[in-house]
């Protein structure tokens, strides 16, 4: 079973993404961190005990990975075109407790599991070989958190909640 984990805004750069959320919601998103495996960086906004909004972009200070970046970020021209056309909320990420089973049944749509870390946080994330969103964002990116509580529980609570989708 898949459960909504987070919503992803893919930005041409972090400053633009954070400014967009500030303009829409009137608050500044706290910094998340860097993803060494993907050469990306994010800001995160808690939306509930196990739900958050992410702004993600290429980290200009990181080395480019030897593989495609997640969320379609290996194609900066497409990211920029999507951004300029108003396509900001690019997709959803859904968690599962059995990523291997899901990918065994539907790997052609979602790709393969990649191990990720950010500080003490660990997770596995399905990434297509080209790094693109499954079905151009019509399907969520599946993932599975490592041991411990959901990371949203440790994020600052700025009072934002997702009322519906």
Where are these regions (language model features)?
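Donor-sugar nucleotide-binding helix/loop cap in glycosyltransferases
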Residues: 59, 67-72
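Vicinal oxygen chelate
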Residues: 33, 44-46, 51-57, 74-84, ...
